[in-house]
Regions:
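Conserved active-site and cofactor/substrate-binding residues in soluble primary-metabolism enzymes
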Residues: 22, 26, 48, 96-100, ...
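Non-catalytic beta/alpha edge segments that cap or flank active sites
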Residues: 2-4, 156-157
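Nucleotide and nucleotide-moiety/phosphate-recognizing core
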Residues: 3-11, 16-84
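Predominant activation on well-ordered alpha-helical scaffold segments within soluble catalytic domains
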Residues: 25-29, 54, 99-102, 144, ...
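Phosphate-binding/catalytic loops
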Residues: 101-157
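Short alpha-helix boundary/capping segments
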Residues: 19, 89, 93, 131, ...
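Helix-loop-strand module that forms the ligand-binding subsite of alpha/beta enzymes
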Residues: 68-116
Length: 157
């Protein structure tokens, strides 16, 4: 029996060996448990977003990207709309950001999700280690709540 096509993709990245950089993967595991009974939601967790993921992005109605941010205050949780990178803008061949993946979906699969959001959690430390900073640890409940609310608001869910 084939699984139904997901309408919503949660695409998280991070590195569990670099402190707060692993928060995206932790949140992906949480989302897999939270939406396990929800046929319309698919979760993919990777160390990096690679161009191959553009096909997955092109096949859904909504996508939620999750990552840490070294440019935001530690423990801050932000949700922003994401637009595809402009045509002709350089897109890395080994790893891509959210805007780059949307551009690849548009350019190579002629399809874009109706809704694309990026949830970032400000990193306090990306030093070697598997423990989150106090700021990121304290932000986890807020991040989980924002993921849940965002996914349940997506069209067709």
């Amino acid at each position: 029996m084939t699984q139904p096509q997901a309408r919503c993709l949660i695409l998280a990245c991070g590195n569990t060996l670099r402190g707060d950089d692993g928060v995206g993967l932790w949140l992906a595991e949480w989302a897999e448990r939270r939406f396990a009974e929800h046929d319309g939601v698919r979760v993919i967790a990777r160390q990096q977003w690679t161009p191959e993921l553009a096909e997955d992005v092109a096949r859904v109605e909504s996508v939620l990207f999750i990552d840490c941010s070294v440019d935001s205050p530690p423990g801050s949780v932000r949700l922003t709309a994401v637009e595809p990178a402009a045509a002709g803008q350089g897109i890395a061949t080994h790893h891509s950001g959210a805007a780059g993946l949307l551009a690849l979906a548009r350019d190579y699969y002629s399809s874009l999700p109706k809704t694309a959001q990026l949830l970032t959690i400000g990193a306090g430390s990306t030093e070697l280690g598997e423990v989150f900073s106090d700021a990121v640890q304290a932000a986890l409940p807020k991040a989980c709540k924002m993921i849940e609310e965002t996914v349940l608001r997506f069209p067709a869910l």
